[in-house]
Amino acid sequence: MTAAAYKRILLKLSGEALMGDDAYGINEDVVSRIVSEIAEVTRLGVEVGVVIGGGNIFRGMKGAASGMDRATADYMGMLATVMNAMALADAMRRNGVEARVQSALRIDQVVEPYIRGRAIRHLEEGRVVIFAAGTGNPFFTTDTAAALRGSEIAAQIVLKATKVDGVYTADPKKDPAAQRFHRISFDEAIGRNLAVLDATAFALCRDQKLPINVFSIFKPGALKRVVMGEDEGTLVHS
């Protein structure tokens, strides 16, 4: 069997990815399919960390826009990510994948606190670690949490799972002539003003020379193809 291109990855999942076609919440069929994709990768011997968003339940920026205190709204968004992480971990266990949730906000009766050394040990022992509650601080996105946790656990790449199959020259929904980048450097992405991750997360990945692959979580087998080093999505590199 061909070896995977990466030994340890950080997968960034948006909360919206868990909704499927629903307007709100967690779609069990979608979660089951995502779990099966992750399970397939773990069977290759790849160590998987996951950062998950909470936008399917509550989005801090939206709460702040409606007049809520921004920090309060962000903390509510962090709690939403804990709910998503617990649902994902439960689905993994039901599918034979060992998983642990570590939260940047302490909720010790429910999930483990985030402890870097413990997270790395879980990964080394073949468990999927789902990092919840973002960075634990308001004003930082879960994209930034993905860049931070990816750097902390010495992941070899951040995989951003989205609804589109990569980074394009323009919005492919609006411009039928838009073309997908197969590979692009951090500097070129900045020069073209491409929104790969939010600015803080992008800068951290660039400074740490941590590559990013943007791909569609809705394409069957895409996660495995990325991990195997195939031409899937868009690779952003130093």
UniProtKB/Swiss-Prot annotation:
Activity control summary: Inhibited by UTP.
Family affiliation: Belongs to the UMP kinase family.
UniProt main location, coarse: cytoplasm
Pfam families in the record: AA_kinase
UniProt pathway: Pyrimidine metabolism; CTP biosynthesis via de novo pathway; UDP from UMP (UMPK route): step 1/1
UniProt-annotated location(s): Cytoplasm
Enzyme class: transferase
Residues the entry annotates as binding ATP: K12, L13, S14, G15, G55, R59, T162, Y168, D171
Catalysed conversion reaction: UMP + ATP = UDP + ADP
Name of protein: Uridylate kinase
Source taxon at top rank: Bacteria
Single Gene Ontology BP annotation: UDP biosynthetic process
Subunit structure: Homohexamer.
GO cellular component, one term: cytosol
Free-text function comment from the UniProt entry: Catalyzes the reversible phosphorylation of UMP to UDP.
HAMAP family: PyrH_B (MF_01220_B)
Enzyme nomenclature, EC number: 2.7.4.22
Keywords from the UniProt entry: ATP-binding, Cytoplasm, Kinase, Nucleotide-binding, Pyrimidine biosynthesis, Transferase
GO molecular function: ATP binding; UMP kinase activity
Keyword Iron among UniProt keywords: no
Residues at which UMP binds: G54, D74, T135, G136, N137, P138, F139, F140, T141, T142
